[in-house]
């Protein structure tokens, strides 16, 4: 198997497939009400809704970087504001997450394999840019990390 299909496999597993670590993100999100999504059971912590918007923003930023865009915070911000907390707004947030995921997978599928080992347009730190492969593995790790946070918040909101 080439690297592109492996990366797509990892993206799909963490999003809605069968990841090694447990439940995928979309399964964790299923059954969460808009009230649960907006709740902040941990003082100074993020809500499920904020985490969903953050994951979406970084999927979009990753896709921007794949197209050669300069690295930076996502266009919508690192932690986009939630806005209104209605049931339709929550459904829309989850749908935007799904769309961002599909667009990212499509962009990865269209990526020429040799580009994976080229540096991204990211010279913010020590002058050594990560490769596109490192960027893509990083977004999988990012999403798994935040999916775990969402799972804990979901459990906490179900216990009250």
Predicted regions and their residues:
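Short, contiguous alpha-helical
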Residues: 2-22, 26-29, 34-81, 121-160
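Acidic/histidine-rich alpha-helical segments that form the ligand environment
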Residues: 82-119, 134-139
């Amino acid at each position: 198997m080439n690297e592109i299909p492996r990366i797509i496999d990892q993206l799909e597993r963490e999003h809605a497939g069968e990841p090694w670590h447990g439940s995928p993100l979309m399964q964790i999100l299923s059954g969460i009400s808009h009230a649960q999504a907006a709740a902040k059971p941990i003082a100074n912590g993020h809500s499920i809704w904020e985490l969903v918007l953050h994951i979406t923003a970084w999927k979009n930023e990753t896709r921007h970087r794949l197209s050669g865009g300069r690295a930076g915070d996502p266009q919508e911000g690192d932690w986009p504001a939630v806005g209104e907390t209605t049931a339709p707004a929550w459904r829309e947030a989850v749908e935007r997450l799904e769309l961002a995921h599909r667009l990212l997978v499509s962009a990865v599928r269209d990526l020429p394999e040799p580009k994976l080992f080229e540096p991204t347009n990211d010279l913010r730190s020590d002058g050594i840019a990560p490769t596109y492969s490192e960027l893509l593995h990083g977004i999988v790790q990012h999403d798994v990390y935040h999916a775990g946070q969402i799972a804990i918040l979901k459990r906490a909101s179900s216990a009250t």
